[in-house]
Amino acid sequence: MQFFKDILNGSDLFDGEWYKETYPDVARLGMDSAEHYLKYGWRMLRDPSTEFSTKFYLKFNSDVKSAGVNPLIHYITQGVNEG
């Protein structure tokens, strides 16, 4: 989990403060923003920032969706190089 949290936190496409402000239930849970997005948020089609649309990415990358892969992690580690 820490490996993937580090990937998110090192990316301009993940904004932990924005995530907590946009989804106040995360703050109420006292959960780390990156951990929430990794475990639950992307499955709830929540966006990790204003710069990345989870729903859009999954819509146009059905292989990622059907594989159950976190869309932002996929984009950062593979998708950005796929074009």
Segments (PLM) and residue ranges:
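Charge-rich, low-complexity intrinsically disordered regions
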Residues: M1-G83
